[in-house]
A protein has these predicted regions:
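Glycine-rich (often Gly-Gly/Gly-Pro-rich) flexible segments and glycine-rich loop motifs
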Residues: 183, 441-505, 599-647
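Long, charged, mostly alpha-helical binding arms that flank functional sites
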Residues: 6-10, 233-238, 371-374, 379-411, ...
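Helix-rich, typically C-terminal accessory recognition domains appended to large enzymatic cores
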Residues: 86, 147, 151-165, 421-450, ...
């Protein structure tokens, strides 16, 4: 045995790069496509935007995915584990404005730096599959797919009110507006009318909803619920309201409450609804136009939000209630949006809270048409009644239960040709036009004769110009002097018209960057950056896509539930219909990892705003329980407040640089810390003591293994049955099998690496060199090394090699356990007589029933404890306890 002074020092800075170089040279993490699918496994983490530096959220996400990939390789799977870059997007243009860097240069310099960081972490990626979405090859293939979508009728252009980010000067999808503000910048979003390119995601609404049932059990319930809510399927009726004095105009409403039709006292309409131009009288024109301008200053999401003030404007027009024939006023309302539903809403103040508040505000009548069972008709006065009840004041439907009346009134409307039963969706088509430079150009042209026409596939790709001026004001491509009218070869852009070639102009909008992330996972299956054709010249190779998809495990944040994840599901179905794949769902299992959180450090400014500090700017003292006793700024020695634990963010400066941790402790320590504290789906709270604890554990494993290496190298690891062992050897032999089972169960069921790591720590505590035989000690150490392999691969590989194994851990495989060797052959029984423990005995586990009772009563210690007293009743729980009444 080596003395502590002779043990090789644990030096991650030397060990880790050496193993990374060996893995890379051996191509250990590349994959073949000729392995049967049942022995293949595709694990993918959501690829990053190349912002320039990894943060701790990245480290946790990728550590989870990499540990799964390494575990599955050890289980004999061919694992596809790729990495790429979601590299189009606004920050590159912001860098051009702030730093004078070209977006392409800035992006690819960041990619190079972050690739190096990922490699230094030892993540086992198939780097031959790497691509960036801004690579010409990927962008060209995406344009190819886009034209296929055009041909299938899934792309169209329309002029409509859009969400306009005042901070980004571009259009946002509905999903990118949060509380009336831009999801990225937090700046206000207003309504603006622009021509937009859209994808018909609504064509797949029904399949997107039904497909969620297939994902049950593989996806988090919270994500499934968010998608169901976003799709928003509603069954109800469309009802036609004639406009008084305008026999050629009909306003159609959608409602899920046709039973309340007789109680309609006004109708609300979107201020931007096209019909208003025809039906608003001159007396109300100025008032309506002013209201329309006011409403345009807010986003659709803000207008429809529960907390927004509900405002209205009388239009001077009236509509006819098709059930009663009564004229009711038409109000323009800020909470009604033209492209949501029909843009017209019937209002029943007696039975809808929002309508009641609106009616109270504007002095509109309230007519009750549903009464609680047992109550008659009458003015309630205390508010709206929204529960089921009995129809009243509704003509032929009086006395009918309101739920039954829904169908009856709908049928009456259909027979009267005044309405119809319909299904509607909250989901809207996906507007993909963005007025930015750093995105994939939309491959369309405009010419006098042809009008709007798709670019021919043989003329792809439409490439971005390098000589572009970016100032944050408007669309850089639209302002470029020549790009829109110049062909790829530098000649004037021409298209083939009916009478011959004619001049054309390119579309200057680029695609929403969610386009790129909607199919990248499929491209990884057939991409190879070592080949001239990049793996395949077509956008996708169907055979290889179908071999690998769906992704077996997809790891990423829950914040993408109704953005990226919904778009990716839609895109996969569309790709299937285009013949690129036979797969309809992209991700079999989804793991939404928790955030990395940290306490905030700040001072309150005189203006009430918080001034945040980075952790290394503050001296914090804690007591034995980790509670803060003092916090002062290093710069001035003045107190700093310690705030609540929140997600790490640059804005609150509660961040830690992963690179600094790697330099100080090594990649394995970082990986172990983010995996060890809690299950992967829960938030992990950053703790420097926790990181130090992870490092201490790795050093302890290192010292144990290296310290016993000389003693154990010539001794085979024990591989027999534990029944052949005695004492501490037998106990540890059973512990080895129990630990393997515990780790295997944890990783197979929930990828609970925290449970597996805890089990490894327990096993390490049992490996006492002074108490164990060399064979059992070696078996314990080597089992520990193999179990830690997926989580801390560098240390594990180094120690595995140190014990004389020429093959690596992947070839060695995951250790197996024998359930029969986990429990001892004999069970220990405390024997209670009259409720007090009088003896402790051991008996074979095979004994049950009368044989077990007979063995208990015949045991010498029990006989002595009974002292001749007869047993009136014996209660024996096999393997647990004995209770005797005398």
């Amino acid at each position: 045995m080596s003395s502590p002074a002779e043990i090789i020092e644990y030096t991650p800075a030397v060990i880790e790069p050496a193993w990374q170089a060996r893995w890379d040279a051996a191509g250990l993490h590349e994959v073949r496509d000729d392995v049967p699918r049942e022995k293949c496994y595709y694990v993918l983490e959501m690829f990053p935007y190349p912002s320039g530096k990894l943060h701790m959220g990245h480290v946790r996400n990728y550590s989870i995915g990499d540990a799964v990939a390494r575990y599955k390789r050890m289980r004999g799977f061919q694992v596809l584990h790729p990495m790429g870059w979601d590299s189009f997007g606004l920050p590159a243009e912001q860098a051009a404005i702030e730093r004078g860097a070209h977006p392409r240069t800035w992006t690819y310099e960041n990619i190079a730096h972050m690739r190096g960081q990922l490699q230094r972490m030892g993540f086992s990626y198939a780097w031959s599959r790497e691509f960036a979405c801004s690579d010409p090859g990927y962008a060209a293939r995406e344009q190819d797919i886009f034209l296929d979508l055009v041909e299938r009728g899934l792309v169209y252009r329309k002029s409509s009110l859009v969400n306009w980010s005042t901070g980004l000067n571009c259009v946002l999808a509905n999903e990118q507006v949060v509380d009336g503000k831009c999801w990225r910048t937090g700046t206000p979003v207003i309504q603006k009318e622009l021509p937009q390119w859209c994808l018909r995601i609504t064509s797949y609404a029904d399949e997107l909803l039904k497909g969620l049932d297939q994902l049950q059990g593989g996806w988090p319930d919270a994500v499934l619920a968010q998608q169901r809510n976003w799709l928003g399927r509603s069954e109800g009726a469309e009802i036609d309201f004639a406009v008084d004095g305008h026999p050629d105009v009909v306003l159609t409403v959608f409602t899920t409450r046709p039973d309340t039709l007789f109680g309609v006292t006004f109708v609300s309409i979107a201020p931007e609804h096209a019909a208003l131009e025809r039906i608003v009288p001159a007396s109300h024109r100025a008032q309506v136009d002013a209201f329309k301008a006011e409403v345009r200053a807010t986003s659709a999401q803000e207008r429809m939000g529960d907390t927004a003030e509900k405002k209205g404007c009388p239009t001077g027009a009236f509509v006819i209630n098709p059930a009663t024939g009564a004229k009711v006023p038409l109000y323009a309302a800020n909470f009604v949006v033209a492209d949501y539903g029909t843009g017209v809403v019937m209002a029943v103040p007696a039975h809808d809270d929002r309508d009641f508040a609106f009616a109270q505000k504007y002095g509109l009548p309230v007519v009750e048409v549903i009464a609680p069972a047992g109550e008659g008709r009458g003015e309630r006065g205390e508010g709206s009644y929204t529960d089921p009840g009995v129809m009243t004041g509704s003509g032929q439907f009086d006395g009918m239960p309101s739920e039954q009346a829904k169908g009856a009134i709908t049928a009456w409307l259909e027979s009267s040709k005044k309405g119809r039963k319909v299904v509607t969706w909250r989901l809207r088509d996906w507007g993909i036009s963005r007025q930015r430079y750093w995105g994939n150009p939309i491959p369309f042209t405009y010419s006098d004769t042809l009008g709007i026409a798709p670019v021919r596939k043989q003329d792809l790709p439409v490439a971005l110009p390098m000589d572009v001026a970016i100032d944050g004001k408007g669309n850089p491509l639209e302002k470029h002097p020549t790009w829109a009218v110049t062909a790829n070869d530098g000649s004037p852009l021409m298209v083939k018209g009916p009478a011959g070639p004619e001049k054309a102009r390119r579309e200057t909008d680029t695609m929403d960057t969610f386009m790129e992330s909607s199919w990248y996972f499929a491209r990884f299956t057939c991409h190879d950056n070592r080949r001239d054709d990049l793996g395949c010249a077509a956008p996708l190779d169907k055979a290889r896509v179908d071999h690998w998809l769906p992704v077996d495990l997809y790891v990423g944040g829950i914040e993408h539930a109704v953005l990226h994840l919904l778009y990716a599901r839609f895109f996969t179905k569309a790709l299937s219909d285009l013949g690129y794949t036979g797969v309809r769902e992209p991700f079999k299992r989804l793991l939404c990892q928790g955030m990395v959180c940290m306490e905030t450090l700040y001072r309150e400014g005189a203006d009430g705003k918080k001034q945040y500090f980075y952790p290394d700017e503050v001296e914090v003292e804690r007591d034995a329980k980790g509670r803060v006793t003092s916090a002062v700024a290093k710069a001035d020695g003045q107190p700093v407040l310690v705030g609540r634990v929140e997600k790490m963010s640059k804005s609150k400066r509660n961040t830690v640089d992963p690179q600094a941790l790697v330099d100080l402790y090594g990649a394995d320590t970082c990986r172990l810390f983010v995996l060890s504290n809690v299950p992967p789906e829960l938030d992990v709270v950053w703790s420097e003591d926790g990181v130090k604890g992870s490092h201490r554990f790795l050093k302890r494993v290192w010292v144990l293994a290296q310290g016993q290496r000389e003693r154990l190298l010539g001794v085979p690891a024990f591989a027999g049955h534990v029944r052949d062992l005695t004492g501490a050897d037998q106990a540890v032999g059973r512990k080895i099998h129990a630990t393997i089972k515990r780790c295997t169960d944890a990783l197979e069921k929930d990828f609970a690496f925290n449970t597996a790591i805890a089990a490894c720590m327990e096993l390490s505590n049992e490996l006492d060199p002074a108490a164990l035989s060399p064979a059992v000690l070696r078996a314990g150490i080597e089992t520990l090394i193999r179990l830690l392999g997926p989580m801390v691969p560098h240390l594990a590989e180094e120690l595995w090699a140190a014990y004389g194994h020429a093959e690596g851990l992947t070839a060695a495989g995951w250790p197996a356990y024998d359930p029969a060797q986990i429990e001892a052959d004999e069970a220990d029984y405390p024997v209670q007589i009259q409720g007090k423990v009088r003896a402790k005995i051991s008996l074979p586990r095979t004994l049950t029933g009368p044989a077990l009772e007979a063995a208990v009563l015949a045991h010498p210690e029990v006989v002595a404890a009974l002292a001749g007293k007869p047993v009136k009743k014996a209660i024996i729980v096999p393997g647990k306890i004995v209770n005797l009444d005398v």
